[in-house]
């Protein structure tokens, strides 16, 4: 059957636009593909192909390539020559490696499916897929989201379910067009504040992680769907505790003093700081107290308040209150807090 389909395609020569060899028990990609220079769609899914043929690189008009459910062990170098490619399916293989430079020529790629493989990391070159709108890497062995991925300005849908990801980089704020983010069953402990900058985000699924609290401003996201079941969220169970006195390190005292002068636009301090880029970088990470609005650097009180999820959100069952993080600079400010703000008990 496969041979007959291939013969038919070859008879069409330059006029052949589509070749489908889905589930034909093929173990080797046909080298005669070079005789189909105007091929647009090549479907080779559900076979036993372990290596692509060199002739694949001649299919420069190809817009869709499906090699899903085969035996590939890497994303092959030949793919980088498919400069017209828009859709690439490599799901269900044994891929543990992406050949160097393979993404360099795929400037038109809008959809990439690498589900069900064995990837432990992604190359920096992932950031060169500038047209990508859909990326799916479910059920791999990823531990990190590379910051280069966050430069994909057109990305609207990102699937990273069932990996081993521990944290989300703050650079996620650059995914301005992201509408759907799926992070089910990872090892994520917290979401960065920068996720609250994703104005177009509508669907967020973080079920089955180890998140206890959400960043300040999280409740203002314009979500339509939010799922967080299977996370050990903080519960509203207040109890009385004795408050110690504020004891700051000399470094924190100095940092707060300098930060206060910077807020006043003190010209002398501003000029001095410009001469010390490392100090400037550290001070740029300062936060503000939610009570007095004064800046602090490395020492503060972690607090939580509870808000009801938006009525516009489709949410996990039984989610009544969302624990949202807030920071207080001192016990003095903590005493002036809103009654709905609680300190977080330290074990």
From Swiss-Prot:
The keyword Electron transport does not apply. SUPFAM superfamilies: L domain-like. Keywords: Leucine-rich repeat, Repeat. PROSITE patterns: LRR. LRR repeats lie at residues 15-37, 38-60, 61-82, 84-105, 108-129, 131-152, 154-175, 177-198, 200-222. Coiled coil: none annotated. PANTHER family: PTHR48051, RAS SUPPRESSOR PROTEIN 1. Belongs to the LRRC69 family. This is Leucine-rich repeat-containing protein 69. It comes from Mus musculus (Mouse). The gene is Lrrc69.
């Amino acid at each position: 059957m496969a041979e007959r389909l291939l013969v038919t395609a070859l008879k069409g020569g330059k006029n052949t636009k589509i070749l489908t060899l889905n589930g034909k028990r093929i173990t080797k990609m046909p080298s005669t593909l070079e005789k189909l220079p105007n091929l647009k769609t090549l479907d080779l899914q559900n076979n036993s192909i372990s290596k692509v043929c060199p002739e694949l690189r001649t299919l420069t008009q190809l817009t869709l390539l499906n090699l899903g459910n085969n035996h590939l062990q890497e994303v092959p170098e030949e793919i980088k020559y498919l400069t017209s490619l828009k859709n690439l399916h490599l799901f269900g293989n044994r891929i543990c490696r992406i050949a160097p430079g393979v993404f360099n020529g795929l400037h038109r790629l809008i959809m990439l499916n690498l589900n069900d493989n064995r990837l432990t990391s992604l190359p920096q070159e992932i950031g060169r897929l500038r047209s990508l709108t859909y990326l799916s890497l479910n059920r791999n062995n990823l531990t990190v989201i590379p910051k280069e991925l966050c430069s994909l300005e057109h990305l609207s849908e990102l699937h990273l379910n069932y990996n081993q990801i521990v944290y989300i980089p703050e650079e996620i704020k650059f995914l301005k067009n992201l509408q759907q983010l799926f992070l089910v069953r990872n090892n994520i402990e917290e979401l960065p504040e920068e996720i609250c900058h994703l104005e177009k985000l509508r669907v967020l699924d973080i079920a089955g992680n180890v998140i206890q609290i959400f960043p300040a401003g999280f409740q203002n996201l314009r979500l339509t769907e939010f799922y967080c079941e299977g996370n050990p969220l903080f519960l509203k169970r207040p109890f009385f505790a004795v408050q110690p006195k504020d004891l700051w390190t000399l470094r924190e005292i100095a940092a707060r003093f300098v930060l206060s002068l910077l807020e006043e636009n003190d010209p002398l301090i501003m000029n001095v700081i410009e001469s010390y880029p490392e100090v400037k970088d550290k001070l740029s990470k300062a936060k503000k107290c939610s009570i007095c609005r004064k800046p602090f650097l490395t020492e503060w009180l972690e607090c939580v308040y509870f808000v009801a999820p938006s009525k516009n959100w489709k949410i996990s069952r039984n989610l009544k209150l969302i624990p949202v993080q807030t920071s207080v600079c001192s016990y003095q400010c903590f005493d002036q807090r809103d009654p709905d703000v609680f300190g977080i008990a330290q074990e």
